[in-house]
A protein has these predicted regions:
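Asp-based, Mg2+/Mn2+-dependent phosphohydrolase catalytic module
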Residues: 1-5, 105, 121-123, 127-228
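Residues in well-ordered alpha-helical elements
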Residues: 40, 51, 98-101, 185, ...
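Short, well-structured alpha-helical patches and their helix-loop capping segments
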Residues: 92-95, 117, 150-154
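Conserved phosphate-coupling serine/threonine residues in phosphotransfer and NTP-handling enzymes
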Residues: 10, 118-120
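N-terminal helical cap/lid subdomain that shapes the substrate entry/recognition surface
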Residues: 2-98, 105-110, 126
Length: 228
């Protein structure tokens, strides 16, 4: 893709190593409220704003408890959020995926802005950024979280806000990079010029192939072949 002005990256599984900690914490948050959700179903909602993902799973597996949702959803989310914050602040092995920081620097050197967006809240995101030293010395031009816009993915609001912050007006000059189905949907809904999936996170290559992103890459440095 020529003439790209902004590349928007997902975080966990795309630019930050995730060894299954997010889905595990999600499952445990439900279990702590005596709710059992199959792991394969949690896998499917990775990438969504977490309060939305919780509601989706409750509607599928516990529709008979709908009257309790106003209490259950924030309670499960609070448990998940605190678990993730504690995990990320304590996890000394947390690291960027190979090539992420070098890629940010490369794009900056050729005048392309970079940004991060995520289904996490700002509280969790700041814990990740702090652990990676990305909060004190940010390698990207902007970061936005799902609780800072009216709706999370697949709505286009996070990408649109990042465009505003980075001074980009044409979504055709924006590249979206992520590891989940909802990343692809978000990129399509924002009318991004290029939607790229990576196999380093929640979805396998075969799963991603069925979702028809513009490109599927095995590592971030493969982006250099797509964006000039």
């Amino acid at each position: 893709m020529q003439h790209a002005k902004l590349v928007v990256f997902d975080m966990a599984g795309t630019t930050v190593v995730d060894k299954g900690s997010v889905s595990s914490a999600f499952i445990q948050a439900f279990l702590s409220h005596e709710l059992d959700i199959p792991a394969e179903e949690v896998h499917k909602v990775m990438g969504y704003r977490k309060v939305d993902a919780i509601r989706m799973l409750l509607e599928r597996y516990y529709p008979d408890r709908k009257d309790e949702y106003p209490v259950l959803i924030p309670a499960i989310h609070h448990t998940f959020e605190q678990s993730m914050v504690d995990f990320y602040l304590a996890d000394t092995s947390l690291a960027p995926l190979p090539g992420a920081e070098e890629l940010f620097k490369h794009f900056k050197s050729i005048g392309i802005k970079t940004a991060l967006n995520t289904g996490f809240t700002r509280k969790i995101t700041d814990a990740i950024l702090h652990r990676l030293n990305w909060k004190e010395s940010s390698p990207v031009d902007a970061v936005i979280c799902s609780d800072e816009v009216p709706e999370g993915r697949p709505a286009p609001f996070m990408i649109q806000e990042l465009m505003r912050q980075c001074g980009v007006t044409d979504p055709g000059q924006v590249v979206k990079v992520g590891d989940t189905e909802v990343d692809i949907q978000e990129g399509r809904n924002a009318k991004c010029g290029l939607v790229v999936s990576v196999t380093t996170g929640a979805y396998s290559r075969n799963e991603l192939l069925a979702l028809k992103p513009d490109h599927i890459i095995n590592s971030l440095d493969n982006l250099l072949l797509l964006i000039h």
